[in-house]
Structures are given as C-alpha cells and as structure tokens.
Regions:
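Cationic, low-complexity basic patches in intrinsically disordered or flexible, solvent-exposed regions
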Residues: 27
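Glycine- and hydrophobic-rich flexible loops that cap the catalytic core of alpha/beta enzyme folds
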Residues: 1-24, 35-185
C-alpha cells in the first residue's frame, strides 16, 4: 500500500476505537453495564494457502499482503511509542523480498532501512509516525486504548484456498485489477 491507503487504515481504526470508547463510556454511565463490549472492526480479508516446510506449518499470503505489511509497520511504531517489549519479531516474511524482511526486522529494533527497495516500508512508517499522535489527540484517545483496540478488536478474515488450487493462476486472476507483478513474483 502507499501512503494514502496506510493513512486511511489508521484513520479507520482510530475512528472505530473512538466510537467504541464513547459507547462504552455511555454504557458505563447508563443502565446496562453487561453490554460493555467493544465492537470489532473488520478490516478485510487475507487469502492464504496452508503450507508445510521443514516441519513447520504456515500460511502463505496470496492476497492481503499489503494490508498485513501495513499492520506490521503500525505494530512496530506502537512498540516504540509505548516503549513495549512485547513485539520481538514480525510474523510476516517475504520469500522473494529479503530487503523487505530486513526492513521490518530493523523497524522492530528501532532502525530504518536505507535499502532502496525498502523505502516504501520506511515512508509508510514515517507517515504513521507523523500522524498517529495528532490523530489520537484529536479523537481523545490515548496510545494504550488505541493499541488495545487494534490488537484485540481489529479482525482480518483469513480465507484459506483449497489445497488443490493452482496458486499462480489464482494469484494472477486476483491481481489483474491491481499493481502489476514483477517477474520474480
């Protein structure tokens, strides 16, 4: 995703976090405290293929990688802004983009990659870093409330494809409307 999509994602999540905070406040002040439940925010889907390699089972993302990458970048930012130690390693990796893997690992460690092919990751991080706190302040949200909402209530629907799916064909069909693929992809 580019900066526009990343900023829209941040805006959407913070809007829902604010809405839920206000609803919970009204419910706590009002009559029915049993309904003190935050509503989830469904962020879309990730189409995945279940793989096993070297004794480990994992999901290969077929569609939704940019959304997952943006969320990982946001998690890195929250780690550093909250001074938290809970996020040690991204659970997202790229088979054909080692520079992106390295860039995400560097973000976890508080560093920005200088590699030319990782600059989109760096620019999205800087964009989120610039806009997160002003957006939260405008919506009267603290960082902890936002982070809790993100990690507990933002939901991505995981859609597994059947094991007999021809992935190259499926991927090609799903991405004909989006960004053109590079040869190695």
């Amino acid at each position: 995703w580019g900066e526009r999509e990343a900023l829209q994602l941040l805006e959407d999540i913070s809007d829902y976090a604010q809405k839920n905070k206000e609803q919970n406040k009204e419910q706590n002040e009002g009559q029915n405290k049993e309904q003190d439940k935050e509503q989830p925010y469904y962020i879309g889907s990730a189409v995945v293929f279940l793989r096993t390699a070297h004794g480990e089972t994992y999901f290969e993302t077929i569609d939704g990688q940019q959304r997952l990458t943006t969320l990982t970048i946001l998690a890195c930012l929250l780690k550093h802004q909250e001074k938290a130690s809970w996020f040690e390693k991204p659970n997202l990796s790229y088979d054909h983009r080692k520079e992106a893997d390295e860039a995400l690992m560097m973000l976890v460690n508080g560093q920005l990659s200088q590699h030319p092919s990782a600059q989109n990751i760096v620019s999205v991080y800087r964009l989120l870093e610039k806009h997160l706190q002003p957006m939260l302040t405008a919506k009267r949200l603290d960082l902890e409330t936002f982070a809790d909402y993100l990690f507990e209530k933002v939901i991505i629907l995981r859609i597994p494809v059947p094991q007999d799916t021809q992935l190259n064909h499926y991927f090609e069909i799903m991405n004909t409307r989006g960004e053109q693929l590079e040869k190695h992809e």
